Amino acid sequence: MKIGFDNEKYLKMQSEHIRERIGQFDNKLYLEFGGKLFDDYHASRVLPGFQPDSKLCMLRELSDQAEIVIVISAEDIEKNKIRGDLGITYDSDVLRLMQIYQGLGLYVGSVVITKYNAQESAELFKNRLEKLGIKVYRHYLIPGYPTNVPFIVSDDGYGKNDYIKTSRPLVVVTAPGPGSGKMAVCLSQLYHEHKHGIKAGYAKFETFPIWNIPLKHPVNLAYEAATADLNDINMIDPFHLEAYGETTINYNRDVEIFPVLNAMFQRIYGESPYKSPTDMGVNMAGNCICDDDACQEASRQEIIRRYYASRRRLLLGACSEEETYKLEMLMNQANITVHDRPVVDAALTEAERTNGPAATLELPDGSIVTGKTSDLLGACSALLLNALKELAGIEHEIKIISPQAIEPIQSLKTKYLGSRNPRLHTDEVLIALSVSAATSKDARLAMDQLPKLKGCQVHVSVMPGSVDIKQFKRLSIQATFEAKYEKNSVFFNNKGV
């Protein structure tokens, strides 16, 4: 992987910039954290060199000044809203996040339940947190929010919310997911702090879109691809252009809400500290790109992967056609097609040659390895073994797992576990390989290559099973699939998608 982002520079510059912003106010800053505080794999893919936990590392540098406030909506508690990436409810994720932050030496001050209306489930969650010794505050639904500014910024609006007692200069406001009410919590606190004679500040920390690179830069287009389901649109910040004559990039929701925020700031402070949505941000990522070409190419590949992921969801009925059409449009804007992903043509060519499912993997040196379906192995399983043999320098003809090791697993699947498919999935073939490694030097050597698969690109000519998809993720392989089922699949239709 070619590095395009200076992570060390980012950690230093970002923490310094946040300290500067704290100093612009009465040593009190409410920082709304958008996106993921850790495990930010999108950023690490489009900015090669960005570490998935960079934002968390940056916060740890400020740990003596920072406290975290976690926000959750009572409506999300009531609906048992699930985090799609983790499969857990938002209220469970609050406890998970607290444990992670505290384990890293970060201080979690409290939890805020927004849109509170004495919902039974919200009250139960509040009681549960308080029994654990966690401070809980309630923020209520405000009639006319967010447009009725005179009412919102009054004792009958923000004034009815609980005042969150904080003890440190930097208050990081985060949440399990979008729509939790982070911004409203920050603004409510500005109102209450002002009542207490403190001129606290507000800032927003989101990595994307990057404000100081071009609108149609592939990194920013990749952000639109990542949020295609939300229909976020990057745009030139008109307020910043008018105030400073400078072109900067923001996204539509921040631009649309800025006049309302500006009016709120004016009502709280008497004047607004910001002239544009860009002014509110503190993101320094754009200043830390050290190889623009590397970041552009990484982002183009991300857009293609997002396109394939959308086509898969469309086949499963999990997204709209509009989402897929938007991704096609973004590919056009980036001047790319699926053929710019090297593993795609290689997989389709192999599938045509063998008249069956095929999979291809691009190794770190750029060479392509293929896998095809056989009586013993599925295409993805064969691909993994072939890639490991190639990395280990083992001749292709050498069998690193003997058929005698595979056949008992096949028998178990078909005779006792009710499976109709005797071929080994990727998880099963890796277990067989690990067993063989106890007695085979070649199998052991192949096993040792597994970490080298991290970040490799894969394409499969059909939709693989969920087990294989999950295994690719566990190995940190970036995989795409054609949105069609294998011909003998019960789900097969001749049209595909």
Where are these regions (language model features)?
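A short, polar/charged loop-to-alpha-helix boundary motif
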Residues: 376-392
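Short clusters of small/polar residues that mark proteolytic maturation junctions
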Residues: 372-373
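Flexible phosphate-sensing "switch/lid" loops adjacent to ATP/NTP-binding sites
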Residues: 1-174, 189-350, 356, 363-365, ...
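Hydrophobic positions on the alpha1 helix immediately C-terminal to the Walker A/P-loop
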Residues: 185
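The conserved Walker
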Residues: 177-178
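Short HxH-centered metal-ligating active-site micro-motif
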Residues: 390-422
